[in-house]
Amino acid sequence: MSNRVIHVSSCEELDKHLRDERVVVDFSAVWCGPCRAISPVFEKLSNEFITFTFLHVDIDKLNVHPIVSKIKSVPTFHFYRNGSKVSEFSGASESILRSTLEANK
């Protein structure tokens, strides 16, 4: 099983992908224990929900982006459809992540 998660390395790359049809963004940090715990789940779900673009953003590396600069806790997940944010939540909950993906299929 391959990893479909795109590790975003620039503000331009994030902006480009946010315009995709269905996007889920994992905003996290390397120092965050819950972020490390949910990461394999996020990768697994990327193979189940193949109609979504799965993005990983390290908030410490992209902190100049307007969206990233507003993140107050990690992990935080944002869900986008055609460039518009449709949902978000914070916390390392597999059940909420899965149900939010299901609701936005």
UniProtKB/Swiss-Prot annotation:
The keyword Lyase does not apply. InterPro entries: Thioredoxin, Thioredoxin-like_sf, Thioredoxin_CS, Thioredoxin_domain. Disulfide bonds join 32-35. The gene is trxA. GO terms for molecular function: disulfide oxidoreductase activity; protein disulfide isomerase activity; thioredoxin-disulfide reductase (NADPH) activity. It comes from the Eukaryota. The record marks 26 as: Deprotonates C-terminal active site Cys. Belongs to the thioredoxin family. Participates in various redox reactions through the reversible oxidation of its active center dithiol to a disulfide and catalyzes dithiol-disulfide exchange reactions. Residues 2-105 form the Thioredoxin domain. PANTHER family: THIOREDOXIN-LIKE PROTEIN 1. Keywords: Disulfide bond, Electron transport, Redox-active center, Transport. Changing residue 35 to S: Loss of activity. This is Thioredoxin-1. Gene3D superfamilies: Glutaredoxin. GO terms for biological process: cell redox homeostasis; protein folding. The record marks 33-34 as: Contributes to redox potential value. The active site is at residues 32, 35. PROSITE patterns: THIOREDOXIN_1, THIOREDOXIN_2.
